[in-house]
């Protein structure tokens, strides 16, 4: 079997040069032709273009489509798999020894002949690793992973069926444990199988049968009123021969296994094994309800108005009160007979319980949104320095004592009790360019931080018409005027241009007049501009001072009203957050001089995408999708957004590409990708992007293939709909923050290995040992810690047609983290993804006036369209954002 090639779209060879078609002639001989085994889709059009969007020889670099490969025969069945890659053009070399480009090199995207995309996410093969990074200062860090030693043993897999079937894993395990005890002579008593509580069992060596049925009797639970025994039939069947060898697994983890993508078994995905064999420990904190009597809870938190204990109901045809019922049934005299009862049943069959007989049991997680005070307390309690966290993890690992687990001994698995020592590198920080009129024109950040002293914005925005409105009764109007003057002074001092006086007088209004006051000040400003003879202009910025109490509710109402109805950008925060006026704080020095490989050589568009979901407990609210994209090339610091609503908890972005028929029955193309590419073209002299880099947040590992298949298809269709043959090469990167990997300095006393918070240095990147041995992923800690333990971000490249080397992509991603508009610090995730999350959170406010802020992540096109969720209920579309607002980073 040949090595893996160029990811989903594939190309001949990929970075390593080997053909990426799996199976080759072997597949043609062993099974039916793979091209017959899959129903092909209509291929996307290919063609040529010109200008900066074109390839090196003047033709547009076409996107290689997704190609089916030959069928593999596994366990006697023919399984159709799609592999990355495709047959090379006629006359092309079948192998190449060219190495991956270094940071300063650019390798042109490979060509491909039209191919067919796969129709199943199971067919997708992820991008192969192009090599390991070398840029930066070498160092070592400790990861909260524990090295696992494997013995050379054969592992056998058995299918288990229990009848009658049970849902409880614990009950299933009890049945298997009883089977092992009572049928020891049939099971080879030396074996200690590992059972997953469902249908899978593994043994270190073969059992003395391939298929056998057993009868197991289990005593019923007397505490539940069940006496006697219950009989179960257990069938154990060999799922295959010795289908997993420890030495093969070790080869895979070392990156030397002949087929890097998976072992030859249809159910065992190697990803599961990597998680199991790269054991990690971490500490998580969450909130729980306090275990206490319900009466105490009601006194502390609730103002309940429910049924009291004197309420009557029918018992055997007799009307009795709750007090009488408990006295007769349980000989229990209620003490608090005037307290209300709890309704513990359903609406159709209510069950009323007195509060005093109920307790809130321990261990119930509180899943709703915490208020600001609770969040502060939670962070304070959960905060641990890196050294404290490392010690806590080691303490837990020693308590668990994995090395002495009987299953570990049975399978020859040894687990170290020390954190894994991992090779890492600290990438150099980028040089930041400021305006030449400032004393400091170029800034070299120190440990991920810098300030605005003696610097001016490179391209500060201008505001000619602004106003201010306050709803904070505790702040005097004179104080608000002083604040506005200081705001104008500070903004002008750092390179912005703001007129000194508002276009209408500063006003103080009552909170219950919010909508009317905002509409009125918008009307007054329009009248002022008309009187001044200003044509085509309107209020550019409305500064709003909010009260401390209920500020969140007011914030949502203001944003919905101003951004979707009035078309006014508002600033409800302090001067340090005034970013929404169309300028740029800073850009990368190398971007201006076009020294960033695979970014500045041709017009490049960087996308960020996220989907956020409603909070727990809401079963009908739509999810929100958001996509942002860079509009300024080569600086890539200004991002336009598109947002849309979609089905409840649907992770795949639905509106990336749309096609509908108009009244004339003609196809009309739309969607978020097309909208943003058209905006890019207008902002860059009619040039289309010749390269796309797509950072996607919120995707779990189990969704990689499905999201990639669907969203890459949408990106290609959107590009092809703009111009025939327009298919720029795409790099698709998943950004993961919700994982449990933590990195610690090797020596907690070496100051040169840490930042001020005693965390690892910003720019620390790891792409070995704790990463996938053959797929393209890396951990990057791009920020300087403030408190607690820093959380590195996991970047996983699912698809790369731009031939990024490890160094090139890692450096680009790290440098982008210095361009976040809200602060003079590098941030922990790449800014396009950060912006997408902010845009999605903002769009959540648009769903309902006065709604509370978002609890998850969101995405894109304001039109949204009318669709139905999985329950057949129409998804409520988002109101459209006014076009003059969308031109700015209003969400930031």
UniProtKB/Swiss-Prot annotation:
GO terms for molecular function: RNA binding; RNA endonuclease activity. Residues 541-848 form the Piwi domain. Belongs to the argonaute family. Ago subfamily. Residues 86-107, 856-866 have a biased composition (Low complexity). Probably involved in the RNA silencing pathway. May bind to short RNAs such as microRNAs (miRNAs) or short interfering RNAs (siRNAs), and represses the translation of mRNAs which are complementary to them. Residues 1-17 have a biased composition (Gly residues). Residues 1-68, 86-117, 850-876 are annotated as: Disordered. GO terms for cellular component: cytoplasm; nucleus. Residues 248-362 form the PAZ domain. Pfam families: ArgoL2 (PF16488), ArgoMid (PF16487), ArgoN (PF16486), PAZ (PF02170), Piwi (PF02171). GO terms for biological process: regulatory ncRNA-mediated gene silencing. InterPro entries: ArgoL2, Argonaute_Mid_dom, Argonaute_N, PAZ_dom, PAZ_dom_sf, Piwi, Piwi_ago-like, RNaseH-like_sf. Keywords: RNA-mediated gene silencing. The keyword Transcription regulation does not apply. Residues 867-876 have a biased composition (Basic and acidic residues). This is Protein argonaute 11.
